Amino acid sequence: MGSSSNGGVPPGFRFHPTDEELLHYYLKKKISYQKFEMEVIREVDLNKLEPWDLQERCKIGSTPQNEWYFFSHKDRKYPTGSRTNRATHAGFWKATGRDKCIRNSYKKIGMRKTLVFYKGRAPHGQKTDWIMHEYRLEDADDPQANPSEDGWVVCRVFMKKNLFKVVNEGSSSINSLDQHNHDASNNNHALQARSFMHRDSPYQLVRNHGAMTFELNKPDLALHQYPPIFHKPPSLGFDYSSGLARDSESAASEGLQYQQACEPGLDVGTCETVASHNHQQGLGEWAMMDRLVTCHMGNEDSSRGITYEDGNNNSSSVVQPVPATNQLTLRSEMDFWGYSK
């Protein structure tokens, strides 16, 4: 019987017969010596070829294939036995599972056996992904079968699709991508936090002398920001006493120290405190003076009468017009000294 050649089929030809077509058409014609219109299935000695050699031997046309077909003659393993010899030089074919019955629309036409190729020698072989389906006809359909031999079979060989490995490889690549994204996200968060710390560090001023800390990034300390009020009080044209004058000069000098400690462009509330302990003692006297000024401001007229005593216990009253004072500035001073207490 002639063999088909690679150029014996038209371009784009794909050979993919069903189980029924393999048995009822191809194998039945083979055992009855009928001629094929196009010979696409070759005769192969299964005991002399390895599965990976069948790809080139059983190739049909130029179209890529993932399964290969051939006719094979079943040889008995032992002359007096019924077992079939399916050993090759590199390994052997081992049957697995039960044979499947192939039927057409009305009757049974043959059987299909599934075999797996193992490398090495039985019973210790290494399983591979090569699978073979072996089709055989029923004895009633093979009237010319010789009782001394088992006859012809048609086989389909292919490689098992190992979906488990594909899924594992895909999941491992996805896991590595997620880990890479997670590391990149962590790096971005660290850079953002670092830039935030560098950005806010100039506004966190800590006093070196005491325990007070000014942190402008806290909203609950927003009340500490006051307009610059450390200036010398306006003169009212009289002296309360020599002690009050000294206290006034001391407070004015301390106010200048506050102004010098401030950086240009910053409010008083954002500066470092450099006043000494003596200033804390003078706060009470300043509050007393503010109360006195507030009491005199409560008069309805625009002038202020101030009474004082001289050294001879002679009291006199001085009425002197007071220039208009910014009420908001005085209120701010009062609130500040009240808050400092």
Swiss-Prot record:
User: Where located?
Assistant: Nucleus
Q: Keywords for this entry? A: Activator, Developmental protein, DNA-binding, Nucleus, Transcription, Transcription regulation
Which residue numbers delimit the NAC domain? 9-160
In which domain of life is the source organism classified? Eukaryota
Tissue specificity, per the record, is: Expressed throughout the root cap, in both columella (COL) and lateral root cap (LRC) cells, with higher levels in the COL-adjoining LRC than the upper LRC. Also present at low levels expression in the tips of cotyledons and the cotyledon vasculature, as weel as in vasculature of the first pair of true leaves and at the hydathodes.
Which is one Gene Ontology cellular component term of this protein? nucleus
- Is Disulfide bond a UniProt keyword of this protein? no
Asked if the Swiss-Prot or TrEMBL record annotates the protein with the keyword Zinc, the reply is no
The GO molecular function terms of this record are: DNA binding; DNA-binding transcription factor activity
Q: Name one GO biological process term.
A: positive regulation of DNA-templated transcription
Q: Which residues bind DNA?
A: 109-166
Domain writeup: The NAC domain includes a DNA-binding domain and a dimerization domain.
What does the protein in this record do? Transcription activator. Together with BRN1 and SMB, regulates cellular maturation of root cap. Promotes the expression of genes involved in secondary cell walls (SCW) biosynthesis.
Q: What is this protein called?
A: Protein BEARSKIN2
Phylogenetic lineage? Eukaryota, Viridiplantae, Streptophyta, Embryophyta, Tracheophyta
